[in-house]
Amino acid sequence: MTATAFRVGLWLAVTASFLLTATNAKIPGVYSGGPWQNAHATFYGGSDASGTMGGACGYGNLYSQGYGVNTAALSTALFNNGFSCGACFEIKCTDDPRWCVPGNPSILVTATNFCPPNFAQPSDDGGWCNPPREHFDLAMPMFLKIGLYRAGIVPVSYRRVPCRKIGGIRFTVNGFRYFNLVLVTNVAGAGDINGVSVKGSKTDWVRMSRNWGQNWQSNAVLIGQSLSFRVTASDRRSSTSWNVAPATWQFGQTFSGKNFRV
């Protein structure tokens, strides 16, 4: 082997080793959010936000899940086919006294629902959530913190922000023997998740597929095993919760794991 060939081979080996290490390494730091952008906002759900319960993210009762009224339904352009569920936004009304609350306050909301398009209406007159518009349909109590009721729709500025949650990531396990459907809620940091894996005490890690919203499924038989979960957020950071469900777990139970740092 010539000296040149040896150096090339050594460089390729070092490069491959570096790429493998970078791929498997943990990403340092915390989620930092994004830049301010422009959109519009309306409201729904009534003065008590009761009409916002359930929704396309699968969170069910938003009060008991800890989201409360600080929620929003996202237009197609923002919803990302459900992968944006759990993302957190800071929103403020464009500083216009005709439509905005004095002082230009901002609100913090979590994406919990989908605002469907209405192609029977033009995008600037009723079809507020039609693509490609970026639009937030806010729980009514949150809208009234930034905009006047008589306005109906207001121009806003928004940005992604880190989600700050109390307690750990929650895993609600539903399904039956050969089908596990896990609802993932209360995610801090980026808030929205791109991947979930589950590990039984007698199995290797099994990558789950997204069923809908933030419900993730697996066909592995896990009954009688303690369960660990690994959640990967949209910023590619991962959080592993070891043995959060004991071997005696039952379908319908919720378990709290390790959350992301904020």
From Swiss-Prot:
All copies of domain Expansin-like EG45, residue ranges: 54-168
Keyword list, A-Z: Cell wall, Cell wall biogenesis/degradation, Disulfide bond, Membrane, Secreted, Signal
Entry-linked SUPFAM superfamilies: Barwin-like endoglucanases (SSF50685), PHL pollen allergen (SSF49590)
Keyword Secreted: yes
GO CC, one annotated term: extracellular region
Membrane topology term: Peripheral membrane protein
Localization: Secreted, Cell wall; Membrane
Leader peptide range in chain numbering: 1-25
Domain spans labelled Expansin-like CBD: 178-257
Pfam families to which the protein is assigned, alphabetical: DPBB_1, Expansin_C
Domain of life according to the entry: Eukaryota
An annotated GO BP: syncytium formation
Disulfide bonds, paired cysteine numbers: C57-C85, C88-C163, C93-C100
Family note: Belongs to the expansin family. Expansin A subfamily.
Function, as annotated: Causes loosening and extension of plant cell walls by disrupting non-covalent bonding between cellulose microfibrils and matrix glucans. No enzymatic activity has been found.
UniProt protein name: Expansin-A3
Organism this protein belongs to: Arabidopsis thaliana (Mouse-ear cress)
Gene: EXPA3
